[in-house]
């Protein structure tokens, strides 16, 4: 299994920087049992002048808030505050080319009722290009994108990614690099963790919103 931290790695957990090895969460959390949490996947890059820059942090953290409010999770953090915390987290861990994962998660709740609070963790780890630079062999998945009438697909919610995990696992088990998911009408929708773009005659085409999670770079 991949290792994302060591004995010295720091994460930001509910207002404090703590060592990842010392971090704890409630095992009765509604997030753990029902996938009721929202998150972002943000990249940072080491620039030619040696500084570290986060890619579109405002857009990512604004979407984190939108995802939380869309699925009725309490949210009280400010985007500017979270960007500052993330910059500090990268510096403390001496990270440049990194993947940043903020997660808003629920307290203990073994029912389906609304919570009166949410918690926040921000983690970061060194990361190479997501799928590398080689051409990929992709396979149309037997799993469809979910019905947009059954879920708020514009929310980047954890539970929704079981669909992505199954599609990706299926493709790799059959010898492919990644999956391509179709919508309910059989149209191309997206990959398990990325939007799809096609270049034709000098123009870019991408599936419309509806059955997809509209990406920040889309």
Model-predicted regions and their roles:
Residues 1-88, 111-218:
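Helix-start/capping segments and mature chain N-termini
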Residues 105-110:
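Short, internal active-site loops enriched in acidic
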Residues 91-98:
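Short secondary-structure junctions
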């Amino acid at each position: 299994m991949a290792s994302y931290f060591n004995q010295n790695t720091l994460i930001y957990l509910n207002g404090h920087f703590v060592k990842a090895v010392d971090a704890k969460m409630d095992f009765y959390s509604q997030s753990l049992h029902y996938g009721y949490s929202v998150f972002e996947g943000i990249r940072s890059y080491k620039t030619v002048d040696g500084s570290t820059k986060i890619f579109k942090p405002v857009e990512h953290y604004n979407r984190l808030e939108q995802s939380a409010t869309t699925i009725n999770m309490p949210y009280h953090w400010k985007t500017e505050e979270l960007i500052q915390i993330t910059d500090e987290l990268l510096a403390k861990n001496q990270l440049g080319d990194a993947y940043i994962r903020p997660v808003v998660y629920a307290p203990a709740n073994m029912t389906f009722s609304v919570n009166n609070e949410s918690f926040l963790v921000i983690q970061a780890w060194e990361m190479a290009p997501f799928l590398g630079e080689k051409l990929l062999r992709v396979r149309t998945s037997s799993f469809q994108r979910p019905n947009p009438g059954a879920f708020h697909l514009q929310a980047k919610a954890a539970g929704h990614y079981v669909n992505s995990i199954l599609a990706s696992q299926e493709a790799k088990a059959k010898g492919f690099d990644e999956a391509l998911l179709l919508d309910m009408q059989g149209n191309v929708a997206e990959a398990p963790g990325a939007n799809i773009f096609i270049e034709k005659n000098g123009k870019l085409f991408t599936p419309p919103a509806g059955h997809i999670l509209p990406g920040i770079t889309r």
